[in-house]
Swiss-Prot record:
Protein name: CinA-like protein
Record-stated family: Belongs to the CinA family.
HAMAP family cross-referenced by the UniProt entry: CinA_B
Signal peptide boundaries: none
């Protein structure tokens, strides 16, 4: 079944925020077997919302709209949906009660904005919101079903999974299956070269790539006569892909790179310490963004040379002789924080994140990182391209990947 997506919000049409909802919904629907054939974005204007809803509903059996269900005056989606149906807004008392309980449980007082969120088109199906106050709702326009969800990503995702997907899944084709592989370390062009011939070797397989620096996601999408056959085809093709890409594949589905690194460290029974300079605490943040990160004992952001010397014991002679951005300093940072925290393994990074500070011999983007572990000390370097944030993220991933490979006894690329 072909599906259309409608994103509602002036902040989207003005480019003030990135439309992550559309990308997420498209990926989830594709994985469920649907085909997203059209997507539109419209500002907070009732007439334009009505026109967009009617146009998409006339051409698709299923439409999913996001945004404009909040408490403010520019949240006009419910009003537009009612007009598209040719009906009025009504206050749903059960929804109002749920909103009141949620608001008062947080020690707040109901206001007109909260009450506005309980107004839905007459005859619509209410979709409860377990993550927020604004409910969603579904309507029928001709032969089309249109679901309206809040634009807040966290609320939209939970409502799609809890309310929408169970309702529409029976209409999805049951002859597809998809595997999502997570990769790091190889650019999209290299992945494409390594995977040449996979689709020809496995008829019914389509490969899709999505770059989100510094990772690349690979979708192995299978279509066959039955879902069981598609499942088997996808697994067979995935095995082929994994063999070609080797350790560049770090996980599947919802696996996250920092989390997988942490699992490798925990599997060795190691305790970890981190020392950072140019990344400013980013590595520690990435590692502790996931549960079960108690393998991390401590971290030090030693941005100034004086902090490197005072906290980590980096020798002043090393700093004078080689500079703060050097293999020697990266090594002493890792060894120093390992001693300081009395741990099994320690990592460090130092570099020039830019946009200023580079020289002819040490350009912007140059980073050194080190891992001090029970088997020895390893130091690596690279010049990363991009803006300051990309250099920092690239360096953080590079040292985590080195740690992953050492902990997992994996070869370096």
């Amino acid at each position: 079944m072909a599906v259309a997506l409608l994103s509602i919000g002036t902040e989207l049409t003005r480019g003030e925020i990135i439309n992550t909802n559309e990308a997420w919904l498209a990926a989830e629907l594709t994985a469920a077997g649907f085909t997203v054939s059209e997507s539109s974005t419209v500002d907070d204007d009732v007439d334009r919302i009505v026109a967009a809803v009617r146009q998409l509903a006339s051409a698709h059996r299923l439409v999913i709209a996001t945004g404009g269900l909040g408490p403010t005056t520019d949240d006009l989606t419910a009003k537009a949906a009612a007009r598209a149906m040719g009906t009025d807004l009504v206050r749903d008392e059960s929804t109002l009660l749920a909103i009141r309980r949620r608001v008062e449980s947080r020690g707040k007082t109901m206001n007109a904005g909260h009450e506005k969120q309980a107004e839905v088109p007459a005859g619509s199906e209410i979709l409860p919101n377990s993550s927020g106050s604004a409910p969603g709702f579904g309507i029928h326009l001709g032969e089309s079903t249109v679901f309206f969800l809040p634009g807040v990503p966290r609320e939209m995702k939970s409502m799609f999974a809890e309310q929408v997907l169970p309702r529409v899944r029976p209409a999805a084709p049951n002859n597809t299956f998809q595997v999502r592989l997570r990769t790091y370390g190889l650019p999209e062009s290299t992945l494409g070269e390594l995977l040449k011939g996979v689709e020809e070797a496995h008829p019914g397989i389509t490969l899709g790539y999505r770059v989100h620096y510094p990772e690349v996601d690979l979708k192995v999408h299978a279509r066959a006569a039955t879902q069981s056959m598609a499942h088997d085809l996808a697994l067979k093709a995935t095995a082929d892909v994994r063999e070609r890409l080797g350790t560049a594949v770090y996980g599947e589905g919802g696996d996250a790179f920092p989390e997988m690194v942490g699992r490798s460290v925990r599997a060795r029974g190691w305790r970890l310490a981190v020392s950072e300079s140019c990344t400013g605490g980013l590595i520690s943040h990435l590692l502790t963004s996931y549960p079960a990160s108690d393998y991390l004992v401590g971290a030090a952001v030693t941005y100034a040379n004086s902090a490197k010397t005072r906290l980590l014991g980096v020798a002043e002679d090393t700093l004078r002789g080689h500079g703060a951005v050097s293999a020697e300093v990266a090594a002493e940072m890792a060894q120093g924080v390992r001693r300081l925290c009395e741990v099994d393994v320690a990592i460090s990074v130092t570099g020039i994140a830019g946009p200023t500070g580079g020289t002819a011999t040490k350009p912007v983007g140059l980073c050194y990182w080190a891992v001090s572990h029970p088997g020895g000390l390893v130091v690596r370097d690279r010049v990363f391209s991009g803006d300051r944030e990309e250099v920092q993220l690239g360096a953080a991933y590079a040292v985590l990947d080195l740690l992953r490979r050492i902990a997992g006894n994996l070869p370096e690329r």
